[in-house]
Amino acid sequence: QNARRGPWHLAGIEINLRMGGTTHPFLALRFLTGGQLDPTSGLFKSQGGRLKYYRATDNLRSPRYRGLLPEDLFDLVTVNKLLYSERTECGVLFHMIGALSEFGKLGVTAIGNSVEEADRLYDRVLEVLEIETGYGRADD
């Protein structure tokens, strides 16, 4: 009981405390690897038992990305060997690519066998996009 106002009044609220952002990256990881969270350790293991880590965003954007077509994006990441591989269970997955050409925005999930590998893949995507979309443009 609340001494100042009488009986407590309960009200339901939602608090969204996901550290990883949206659920899309986790669902993609689960779908691609066939894995699940280990209830004892809290770590994600692929169906083959490998620990998996990811780094993701649903808000990667730059005015420089405008005009970049989805097929251009896939050419860039294929040439740079960044696409997800079933064999290694590592690589990069893109989503929201429909917003790429018009709005310069997309989502990316980088999956690795370590935190460092996931970070390296994610950073490499940023580097490739920066280099490839910067040709012929004056610095602002």
Which residues fall in each region the model found?
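ATP-dependent carboxylate activation and anion-phosphoryl transfer catalytic cores
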Residues: 1-140
